[in-house]
Amino acid sequence: MSNTDKERAIAAALAQIEKSYGKGSVMKLGQRPHVDIEAVSTGSLGLDIALGIGGVPKGRIIEIFGPESSGKTTLTLHLIAEAQKKGGTCAFIDAEHALDPAYAKKLGVNIAELIISQPDTGEQALEIADTLIRSSGIDMIIIDSVAALVPKSEIEGEMGDAQMASQARLMSQALRKLTASINRTNCITVFINQIRMKIGVMFGSPETTTGGNALKFYASVRIDIRRIGSIKDKEEVIGSQTKVKVVKNKVSPPFKTADFDIMYGSGISKEGEIIDLGVKLDIVEKSGSWFSYKNVRIGQGRENVKQYLKEHPQISNEIEKIIREKSSKITNINLDQTEEEND
């Protein structure tokens, strides 16, 4: 078959597909209107850099998992606040029935515009999510959490009844149904997940996430968040030191890490990240306990410098801008072969 005949055959096939399934159902990749991946900031400067595109990608599934009280919900509330700043409409499926509106407001969430649902069953939660995504009016939807998506059969059954893999089947079926809608509507879909321990594991990590393996495959980005220490003011604990690892990333190189402070009552400390990344990139000078910017001392001790940056937002914004410009120099990639995922 000559090249001309091939082109005619392909054109006829494409015309037939478009006639059957509508215009735009098949095309050459270069003809797609959005080639570049759009992103929404996570509210963490370090995590935005670690993700490689400046935040979480639009039209993709994101999984955020970690131990209890590690900052999972805090991170998702920052995501909502950032999406709302860009004029986005967000929804929160609160399957755990534990969302605190006062805390969400402190983190910058416009609670008057946030759509919330507190479903009774896993099927109901995922059907609500599906309807909202298909509406094309939602920019971001949070499902908190996968562990709380209890199948109807389990709720209606007796305590102690065996429900073998019913939640995993529910998640697998839902994700098959949701994936196309999420991509078509450009909706960011974030699943919060919990960690469980596998019994009888002799080698490797015994940790696993709930809901089976489907979410691991369908997620474009998987973020592991851990509390690694406490922040104290004298004897009082005022926050948590947090480490985040991007364990899977389909839009940029994975296995990058970021550290930030989560302050109780106010969320992720932007100023703390600016100090740490500024020092790492030689934008802020550190000599002993003193910090300087452009040869001017801005404070002694990290907490005092954080306060200085809060009081001088123009300097904070200036340093942040330089950090983002130099962010390509950060190469904190941990290629741990035992944690690599091939999917």
UniProtKB/Swiss-Prot annotation:
InterPro entries attached to this UniProt entry: AAA+_ATPase, DNA_recomb/repair_RecA, DNA_recomb/repair_RecA_CS, P-loop_NTPase, RecA-like_C, RecA-like_N, RecA_ATP-bd, RecA_C_sf
Record-listed ATP binding positions: G66, P67, E68, S69, S70, G71, K72, T73
Protein name listed in UniProt: Protein RecA
Localization per record: Cytoplasm
Key words of the record: ATP-binding, Cytoplasm, DNA damage, DNA recombination, DNA repair, DNA-binding, Nucleotide-binding, SOS response
Functional summary from the UniProt entry: Can catalyze the hydrolysis of ATP in the presence of single-stranded DNA, the ATP-dependent uptake of single-stranded DNA by duplex DNA, and the ATP-dependent hybridization of homologous single-stranded DNAs. It interacts with LexA causing its activation and leading to its autocatalytic cleavage.
Magnesium is among the record's keywords: no
